[in-house]
Regions:
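Feature for soluble, non-membrane regions of globular proteins
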Residues: 3-6, 10, 14-228
Length: 228
């Protein structure tokens, strides 16, 4: 595991900053490794997607460091370095975490969900039945304009909902905890499925990691109890 100090040194070198330059605000995200055993995605696709994810992590760290010295006095809504960095910070932060959530909840070769499982019961409760949740989620996958489909736990209503996210930061619902994440940017599937997003998402749904999903559900509902 690389230490925060080592990563800050990497950031300094990439930005050509000397040792005296403070990068206190650098949040120092670290890349994670995912063993995607699925055969529904080719090796080239997996490698390209991995490199894209690593790029978001690197950019997030750079932006976070640049914010340390950004001018906060001459800021306006039309054009300013601070505004641009804050927008890019959210974009890259969402991108890296959405990718981590996605990689972690796909590629389970022993994927299985039972009617008495927590995930099955919760999704059936809030969507009428499990099949209705799945149909709605697949519709969200098709509706996204280069972005994501996400099943969230709404901490305010304490119910599960599906959402369409465009890019990484458009239409992101507030106060919601992601439990199922599907990447429907074309980079996620074009090398293997061309523009056939439906075949791609159907394949990914067959290998959802319900163990990971249920762990997220438990965490989400614990958070909701704390903030009630």
């Amino acid at each position: 595991m690389i230490s925060n100090g080592d990563i800050k040194s990497i950031i300094r070198n990439s930005m050509k900053l000397d040792e005296k330059t403070r990068i206190d605000e650098a949040l120092v995200a670290q890349t994670k490794t995912y063993d995607l055993k699925t055969e529904f995605l080719s090796g080239k696709n997996k490698q390209a997607h991995k490199e894209l994810y690593e790029g978001y992590v690197e950019n997030f760290n750079k932006i976070s460091a640049e914010l340390d010295t950004a001018d906060r006095d001459n800021v306006n809504a039309n054009h300013s370095q601070f505004r641009s960095l804050k927008i890019d910070e959210t974009y890259n932060m969402n991108a890296l975490y959405l990718h981590e959530l996605y990689f972690a909840n796909i590629s389970d070769l022993q994927s299985n969900i039972t009617m008495d499982s927590l995930a099955y019961m919760r999704l059936s409760r809030d969507f009428g039945d499990f099949d209705k949740w799945q149909k709605d989620f697949m519709a969200c996958c098709s509706a996204s304009r280069c972005g994501w489909a996400v099943t969230y736990y709404n901490l305010f209503t304490q119910t599960y909902m599906n959402a369409v996210i465009d890019l990484h930061s458009i239409e992101v619902p507030i106060g919601c905890f992601p439990v199922i994440v599907m990447d429907v940017w074309q980079h996620a599937y074009y090398k293997d499925y061309l523009r056939d997003v439906n075949t791609y998402t159907t394949a990914m749904m067959k290998e959802l990691n319900w163990t990971v999903v249920e762990d997220r559900i438990r965490k989400a509902e614990k958070i909701a109890q704390v903030i009630r």
